[in-house]
Amino acid sequence: KVKNTMAQNDTAKNGNGGNLGFEADLFKTADKLRGNMEPSDYKHVALGLIFLKYISDAFEARHKALLAEDAQAAEDKDEYLADNVFWVPKEARWSHLQANAKQPNIGTLIDDAMRAIEKDNESLKGVLPKDYARPALNKVMLGELIDLISGIALNEEGDRSKDILGRVYEYFLGQFAGAEGKRGGEFYTPRSVVRV
């Protein structure tokens, strides 16, 4: 559903000149799921999950390619790191989290996934959010958000995948900035500046 929406909404524009498609629909749906949570808290929940989906999709694409070449290489962490792909342990892969999205312990599973990814990827140590198990976070909402994010294809070929991730992050940050009562320019760097 999200993939089809991207093509249908190509004509809408955001404030930075980027095409709006699935980002707006994704944010509207995700925003409804947040309940009474403050946008400043919710952004970490949503963006952390989107990043997790992105690295898991990249890992799975590389894993599939390596399996076709050499099954033994597919289990070698260095094969992924050599291609600038994060190693994602089995318990941290999106497919595992999606399969368990409706479980009452989904918050703990996500926190454990983030810890496992940090453990196996030095550059991510201490960076990923690990507070999905907190009691104040509605686990039903969290499971629904996982299902929603599962519809985003973040494993496109080459730079297109990074562009999709960037579009989602940029749009979400702009929306969160507005929800927090700040002008978007005070909250994140616009696309035009990033390219400079």
PLM regions and their residue ranges:
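Non-catalytic, mostly N-terminal accessory regions of nucleic-acid modification and defense proteins
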Residues: K1-V196
